[in-house]
Amino acid sequence: MSLSKTTLLLYPLCFFMLTNSYAAEAVIEEAPYTLMNVLANKGLHDFKDERWNAYGQLTYIENWKSGFPAAYTNFNDTPNSLLSHSENGFTGTATFYFGLKTWQGGELYVVPEIISEKPLSGLKGLGGIIQNFELQKNGTSTPILYRSRFFFKQTIDLGGNSIHLDSAPMQLDSTVNSKRLVFRIGNFSILDFFDQNSFASNLRRQFNNMAFMTHAAYDFAADARGYTDGGVVEYYDDDWTVRFAHIVAPKNPNQLRLDFRMFKYFGDQIELEHRHVLYQQAGAVRLLAYRNRENMGSWTDALAAFQADPNQNATTCTGFNYDSTNASAPDLCWARKANIKMGFGVNVEQQLADDIGVFFRGMYSDGKTEVYSYTSTDSSISLGSLVKGTRWDRNKDTVGIGYAQNWISKQHAAYLNAGGVDGFIGDGKINQKAEKAVELFYSLNVIGAVWLTADYQHLMNPAFNGDRGPVDVYAVKTHIEF
């Protein structure tokens, strides 16, 4: 599908979503069908004095990619291009959330997870617009069981109004003060607590593209599945929250093994959040900054090492590398040392009516060093809107539209143009352009806590390369909560 045809399709939907903004009547939804609600209805579980809880989810996503035009693919034996022929892939996940109250304000959570996946093109060829967010889990077609989270949480009330927190995955039903300290220590995803957004975070019931899960340029320290170890502290003061985390970095970029020398190599982040009501509609603004110290190579140093000695190329490295067979290209393995990476971002969400919400994210990272844990992006924006189905008597349905655009630094582009690769991209050369993605989805509530989503994505300039694409990706997603 051409961009012009895609644009013609977007106009009517945008008009419907953003101009049909009268306030819908409030809808009272029945309690979701979960194990906890079933037990509570039988008198076997007490939400008012919840000592434990258990939840789960199943998600299966099937992707189809069309063939697309490309001036070249894997030029000069550089291996990281998105393949230009049609492909299909899938992901399947099962997650089980267990919570236990230890004492007043103390809670313990453990979350085992199963992943099975087959990525398009071996998960190569897309920078910050990877079409399926579950692909960060680093699985194989054979299901793999692992522990995703195991952490302790302590809440210290400091006064103010009482706030009720409903029972949910990784949250025991409880009442807390509006002024409070919250400490967490253990194994978790930093995205469990940072850069949350009501309309673009919980992608199992929203978008599919990884650009909408968080800032594409947020290179948060984590293993290849997106998890880490460390500590998080939050201070809540009514409508304000400030949170800080010090977390462990991976031993090698985008790999599973973590480096527990957490005061030598680490990721720090701080976020300031303000929640507000604007014209009787809820919203929030979040400012995020991160600073990583990791054993990573800079684009400039890798190029300089190759230019000084062509034997220091992509095929001769004995350290960690991405298996490039391009002997005329530089490689980051010759430049790895302790380096600093920093980034700053803004995250905004706003309800326009009871059933319409919009969001925006934007982040700038310095772009001097290699991607270590997330996507091959140095700066990014994303925006979009969700509309609930109350307007057409489908209260649990959702329709969404999103747009994302990502950039890389000049140093990053120069390295790629010399034939270098990073964890996800490298076509052998590059006609540097911004990556862009448009995504449309309709999430249909089939019954109870079962959703079926049809999803379409139009991806432009894959791997920041104007010589390749555009690419159309179609998906069907089945999601069950229990």
Residue spans of the language-model regions?
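Surface-exposed coil loops of outer-membrane beta-barrel proteins
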Residues: 125-142, 161-271, 420-425, 430
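Short loop/turn motifs that connect adjacent beta-strands in outer-membrane beta-barrel proteins
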Residues: 39-54, 65-67, 99-108, 121, ...
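N-terminal regions that are enriched for targeting/export leaders
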Residues: 26-101, 111-113, 119, 125, ...
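Outer membrane beta-barrel transmembrane domains
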Residues: 271-273, 288-338, 359, 366, ...
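Residues that define the transmembrane beta-barrel architecture of outer-membrane proteins
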Residues: 50, 88-94, 143-148, 225-229, ...
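Residues on the lipid-exposed face of transmembrane beta-strands in outer-membrane beta-barrel proteins
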Residues: 56, 94-100, 150-154, 185, ...
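Transmembrane beta-barrel strands of outer-membrane/channel proteins
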Residues: 54, 58-62, 110-114, 183-187, ...
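Outer-membrane beta-barrel "beta-signal"
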Residues: 26-29, 148-161, 401, 470-482
